[in-house]
Curated annotation (Swiss-Prot):
The keyword Lipid metabolism does not apply. InterPro entries: Aldolase_TIM, PRAI_dom, RibuloseP-bd_barrel, TrpF_fam. It catalyses: N-(5-phospho-beta-D-ribosyl)anthranilate = 1-(2-carboxyphenylamino)-1-deoxy-D-ribulose 5-phosphate. The keyword Isomerase applies. It comes from the Bacteria. One of its GO terms (biological process) is L-tryptophan biosynthetic process. SUPFAM superfamilies: Ribulose-phoshate binding barrel. Keywords: Amino-acid biosynthesis, Aromatic amino acid biosynthesis, Isomerase, Tryptophan biosynthesis. It holds the Pfam family PRAI. It is an enzyme of class 5 (isomerase). This is N-(5'-phosphoribosyl)anthranilate isomerase.
């Protein structure tokens, strides 16, 4: 099974080059002002040019207004929207129709009962991103470097397309792939030398760890 890999929170040409060079299927740009990974729409539009024909460029937003989304879509020309806030199913459907783009809906998980939150979005969201619930007091809905118990995904309905996120890094990606067997993975803080600072060497290390883990499973 092919594994989609998204490097999220990109802000520099060097990080983009490392992500694409490693074989990222998706590259993500954060449009949430409180995040250290925030990037201006015009700059994201410049950066995403390197990904054309190589990777899916994802615009990550958090309860964004229509006006801000219009600016993002115009300046960046994303291939996909990722909604990482409290957007309800009707809002997801509205934005899909407004922009004609596929939507990935992020949902925070911590226990098996949280899987019930997926059902209202089935048939509306094109894909899900499962992240850990933010630590108490955190202003960031994602990118907190926190993992959840991946074993709860065993209760997921067959056919649900998703990316696994939350606290992934080179040290634990093998366990994550073994326990959850996800169709896709998303990493942000796990390839940073400081909050918001992507490290090309850590990106390369992560891709090596993914390849090693997949080789071990295939052996």
């Amino acid at each position: 099974m092919a594994l989609d890999i998204k490097i999220c929170g990109l802000k520099t040409d060097q990080a983009m080059a490392a992500a694409l060079g490693g074989g990222a299927s998706h590259v993500g740009f954060i449009f949430f002002a409180k995040s250290p990974r925030y990037v201006e729409p015009a700059e994201a539009g410049r950066l995403r040019e390197a990904a054309r024909g190589k990777a899916v460029a994802v615009a990550v937003t958090v309860d964004a207004t229509d006006a801000f989304l219009d600016e993002i879509v115009s300046a960046m020309q994303p291939d996909m929207l990722q909604l990482h806030g409290s957007e309800h199913p009707e809002r997801v459907a509205e934005l899909k129709a407004r922009y004609g783009l596929p939507v990935m809906k992020a949902l925070p998980l911590s226990e098996a009962a949280d899987l019930d939150r997926i059902r209202p979005f089935i048939g509306i969201a094109d894909r899900f991103l499962f992240d850990a619930k933010p630590p108490k007091g955190s202003e960031l809905p994602g990118g907190n470097g926190v993992a959840f118990d991946w074993r709860i995904l065993a209760g997921l309905d067959a056919g649900v397309d998703y990316m696994l996120s939350g606290g992934l890094n080179a040290a634990n990606i093998g366990d994550a792939l073994r326990l959850a067997n996800p169709p896709g993975i998303d990493i942000s803080s796990g390839v940073e030398s400081a909050p918001g600072v992507k490290d090309p060497a850590l990106i390369e290390q992560f891709f090596r760890a993914v390849r090693a883990a997949r080789d071990d499973r295939a052996a």
